[in-house]
Curated annotation (Swiss-Prot):
ANK repeats lie at residues 27-57, 74-103, 107-146, 166-195, 199-228, 233-272, 276-305, 309-342. InterPro entries: Ankyrin_rpt (IPR002110), Ankyrin_rpt-contain_sf (IPR036770). It holds the Pfam family Ank_4. GO terms for cellular component: nucleoplasm. PANTHER family: ANKYRIN REPEAT DOMAIN-CONTAINING PROTEIN 61. SUPFAM superfamilies: Ankyrin repeat. The keyword Transferase does not apply. This is Ankyrin repeat domain-containing protein 61. One of its GO terms (molecular function) is DNA binding. Gene3D superfamilies: Ankyrin repeat-containing domain. It comes from the Eukaryota.
């Protein structure tokens, strides 16, 4: 019994010593945490004598300024703390004392990645702050930029990828989190604009997918490949932009025309096909948004390209009943299409014209598809497809008015379809 008592006493002493050590460590961590937040560089230097600069801090639940969205006891590296809270003086002090900018947290983020994840939102249009709130917002932005400059000046790897399943680069993160102002800075500091993530998407793919014209313009200016295709799907930036712009949200917001034109003006191949054989025009026709379809036609999109399943752009257009209501656009597409293929490889007609209310239209289109065109009509279609909308008025100056009207007159077909509901 006596031996048990003595051993228990020694255990109590050891436990007490451990508690004292933990208490001292907790106090040290809390003081260093507060010094970093307050940018008290003298205190930081003093505390780093007893705390390795690349050792994480563990902040307990009673710390007043810890991140609300994180677990209160989650460890954080001092340099990550300074970067997340945009404390340039603390960041510089830590780097000067040997902090490693490439140290990663439990999610695989480096200091630069965390800076981009926590970049302050910027929706201000004023150039000079006039209120206290504007001044605070401007100071926050300036501190973020200064921290970014300090990191890059101290060798932060701008092409390091996040160590997780996405493998995003800094440029990918900048686009995801809307940090447009840093794109050019990263590119100027060596960021690879054509780097791909785990999904084989480049930064341009991501910018096009969200229809951010400023980001697209910046990336192209720094050499982004506008025709790079995602390996898994074959989608290009143009196809992604058309898909988003043709969606319900894109239609409601009237978004994307500027982005698509920007891509086309910078060499995007309008007739590029994905792995299923779809072009941007197939996507646009399925969406049925007239502005997007017209823009692609202006840049000589081919209305006769078939997918691997034998579907033409007009087949995609006729898939949705909402598209069929726009008879003028339908007529324009029909007048460019030859031969008219209404069914796919399985012989299935588009779902839209299979509805009972479109029976007469379906019968009319089937007759048109089976009726061979005259040589004159084929020639007119060829001229329309070669010159397109882009050079149509230039052609008007060269041809007799009657001939030009016969080539570009589509009202007869519109009239033919007018009787449908």
């Amino acid at each position: 019994m006596g031996n048990i008592t003595k051993r228990g006493s020694r255990d109590l002493v050891a436990d007490g010593a451990t508690l004292v050590e933990e208490s001292l460590a907790t106090t040290l961590h809390s003081k260093l945490y507060e010094a970093i937040i307050k940018e008290d560089c003298n205190t930081i230097k003093t505390l780093l004598r007893n705390h390795p600069v690349n050792q994480p801090l563990t902040i307990l639940a009673n710390s007043t300024r810890y991140r609300l969205l994180s677990q209160q006891t989650q460890p954080i590296f001092p340099i990550h703390l300074a970067a997340e809270y945009r404390k340039p003086q603390s960041l510089l002090c830590l780097l000067q004392h040997g902090a490693d900018p490439e140290v990663r947290d439990a999610q695989g983020f480096t200091t630069l990645h965390l800076m981009l994840l926590n970049w302050p939102a910027s929706s201000t249009t004023w150039s000079k702050p006039s209120t206290q709130i504007q001044k605070i917002l401007m100071d926050i932005q300036n501190n973020a930029v200064l921290c970014l400059c300090i990191l890059c000046d101290h060798g932060a790897q701008v092409n390091a990828r996040v160590d997780n399943s996405n493998k995003h680069s800094a440029l990918h993160l900048a686009i995801i989190h809307g940090t447009y102002p840093v794109l050019s800075f990263l590119a100027q500091n060596g960021a690879q604009v054509n780097a791909t993530n785990e999904s084989s998407m480049t930064p341009l793919h991501m910018a096009a997918d969200i229809l951010n014209k400023n980001m697209i313009e910046t990336l192209i200016a720094f050499g982004a490949n506008v025709n790079c295709a995602i390996s898994s799907t074959g989608n290009t930036a143009l196809k992604l932009a058309v898909c988003t712009a043709s969606s319900k949200v894109g239609r409601l917001l009237a978004a994307g025309v500027g982005c698509i034109r920007l891509l086309l003006n910078n060499g995007a191949q309008v007739n590029a096909q994905d792995h299923e054989g779809q072009t941007a025009l197939h996507e646009a026709c399925f969406g049925g948004r007239e502005a997007i379809i017209s823009l692609l036609l202006e840049f000589e999109a081919n209305v006769n390209i078939l997918t691997r399943n034998g579907e033409s752009p007009i087949y995609m257009y006729l898939q949705r009943s909402s598209n069929i209501r726009d008879r003028s656009l339908l007529a324009r597409l029909l007048y460019r299409t030859y031969p008219l293929r209404l069914s796919n490889k399985q012989g299935i007609l588009p779902a839209g014209i299979m509805l009972p209310e479109y029976q007469l239209l379906r019968e009319t289109l089937v007759k048109l598809s089976k009726k061979p065109l005259t040589l004159e009509a084929i020639c007119k279609r060829s001229i329309r497809n070669v010159y397109g909308e882009k050079y149509k008025f230039h052609l008007e100056k060269l041809l007799p008015a009657k001939l030009w009207n016969s080539i570009y007159g589509i009202y007869d077909l519109t009239y033919l379809l007018k009787g449908e509901p």
